[in-house]
Each structure stands twice: as C-alpha cells, then as structure tokens.
A protein has these predicted regions:
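Hydrophobic core of alpha-helical transmembrane segments in multi-pass integral membrane proteins
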Residues: 29-33, 54-66, 88-102, 161-164, ...
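Transmembrane helix-loop-helix
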Residues: 81-86, 98-114, 224
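The first (N-terminal) embedded transmembrane alpha-helix
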Residues: 17-37
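Short, hydrophobic transmembrane alpha-helix segments
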Residues: 34-47
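Membrane-interface capping segments at transmembrane-helix boundaries
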Residues: 4, 69-73, 240-246
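Membrane-embedded catalytic cores of phosphoryl/pyrophosphoryl-handling enzymes
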Residues: 108-245
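Short, Lys/Arg-rich, polar N-terminal cytosolic tail immediately upstream
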Residues: 1-14
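Juxtamembrane helix-capping/reentrant segments at transmembrane boundaries
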Residues: 74-91
Length: 246
C-alpha cells in the first residue's frame, strides 16, 4: 500500500514536470532570454519577441486546444502518434509563416538564429514521428538548455540537469522509451549546434562560449583527478537506471 502511494506520487511529479517543460511553455523563457538579456533598447525588440511567441507557441497551442475540445486529440500533449499528424501540420505551417514575418521585421541575429532552429528542427522531428515516436519534450528542453548556454555562458550549465529530469519523466510516464528520448536530444542538439556554428555563436570570440571555454580549461586539472572516479560512478548509475527501465 505504501509502495503504491509512493509510486502514485512519483507519477504525479513526472506528469507535473512534463507539463512545466512542454514545448509551448519553454518557448517563453527561450525568447525572453535571447530578446531581453543584456539589451538596451527593449521597446524595439518587443514586436519581434511577440511575433516569435505568437507563431511558435500561442497559435499552435490554441489550435491544439481547439482540437482537444473537438475531441480530435485525446490529450493536450498528444501522446498518441496517430493523432499527431494534423496538429503537426498546423504547427509547422505556423512556424514557416512566422519566419517570413520575422524576415520582414529584420530582428536581431540571435533571435533569427533560434527561430531557424525551430524552422529546421520541428519539421525534422515531425517527419521522424510519423514512423517512430521521438520525444518532443526531450527536443524542446535540449534546445532550451543550449540557448541558455549561449546566452548566459557558465550559468547556463545549471539547465543541463533539466534534460535528464524531463527525459526521466517521459520514460516514467511510459510515453517514450530511453531511445526515443535520446533521439530527441540528438536531433535537436545537432541542428542547434549546426545553426549556432554557421551563425558564428560557437566561436571563442563570442562572450558566452569564451566563458565556457575558460571554465573548462580552468577546471581541467581538477577533472583529471576526479574524472576516472566520476566516470565509474556514472557507469554504475546508468547501468542501474537501464536495469530499472528494462
């Protein structure tokens, strides 16, 4: 009885995590960070910020809500792969339309770069989900973490554990397998890093990357001492998680 109650609490916590880190929710902190952190002329940024939010979150979420009320989808997070096609068509159309609006507005380079990741990443994940249930949650939280690393430098490292937390929640709720979570991380991670590399944000000339590079170099001696033990511990932890899941 106690074990059952504990399991219910764990499932409830996993569900809360899934809702908090839903893609439509994470859009707001992503664009808030890139649009307003360290900026001077905030009023000039607001139109582009609102445009990005409207086309990546507001319209797609309202469309899914209407589909849910019309009973075209059984859950707001659309866990059933067969129900995803029409909502994804709407969302991808919104993303493409928003891109052309943003091009006309000529936003800052970082905002356009992040929007490009949505423009390339969402269709890629949408195509994959037609035959394999890749994790959208894992994709979105990975993008969130990478953006925060680009914007906030070393402080962005604090967001990396969120990827593990969200991945755990999706597996715990049995919405995805470990492979599907890792797939979401890999796809959006690759696209994000490629876009940021092409647009010049992955060089040490950029403040955040320079800061991260310095942090890694300054801690290298310490890591040389602790990494073998840490690596062995990590292997045992991953083995334990694998055995628990499978």
């Amino acid at each position: 009885m106690v074990q059952k109650h504990k399991n219910l609490k764990t499932l409830r916590f996993a569900k809360i995590i899934s809702y908090i880190f839903d893609g439509s929710v994470l859009v707001l902190p992503v664009f808030l960070a890139i649009c307003f952190y360290g900026k001077q002329n905030l009023a000039a940024i607001v139109p582009a910020f609102l445009t990005a939010i409207i086309f990546t979150a507001l319209i797609p979420y309202m469309a899914i809500l209407l589909l849910y009320k019309a009973r075209k989808v059984s859950d707001l997070q659309i866990p059933k792969r067969k129900e995803r096609l029409f909502p994804l068509l709407i969302i991808n159309t919104c993303i493409v339309a928003g891109f052309f609006v943003l091009i006309y507005m000529q936003p800052e380079k970082l905002l356009l770069s992040v929007y490009m990741i949505y423009l390339l990443g969402l269709p890629a994940i949408s195509l994959i989900t037609l035959f394999w249930k890749i994790s959208f949650h894992a994709s979105y939280v990975t993008l969130f973490s990478i953006v925060y690393l680009i914007v906030f430098g070393k402080w962005g490292i604090l967001t990396i554990p969120l990827i593990l937390l969200v991945g755990w929640s999706r597996i715990k709720l049995k919405r995805h397998t470990l492979a599907q979570v890792l797939g979401g991380i890999a796809v959006i991670g690759t696209i994000s890093l490629t876009v940021f590399y092409i647009t010049g944000y992955l060089t040490t000339d950029y403040r955040a990357i320079s800061e991260l590079s310095w942090l890694l170099r300054s801690s290298s001696d310490y890591m040389n001492l602790v990494l073998p033990g840490f690596g062995l511990t990590l292997v045992f932890i991953l083995a334990y998680i694998f055995l628990q899941i499978y």
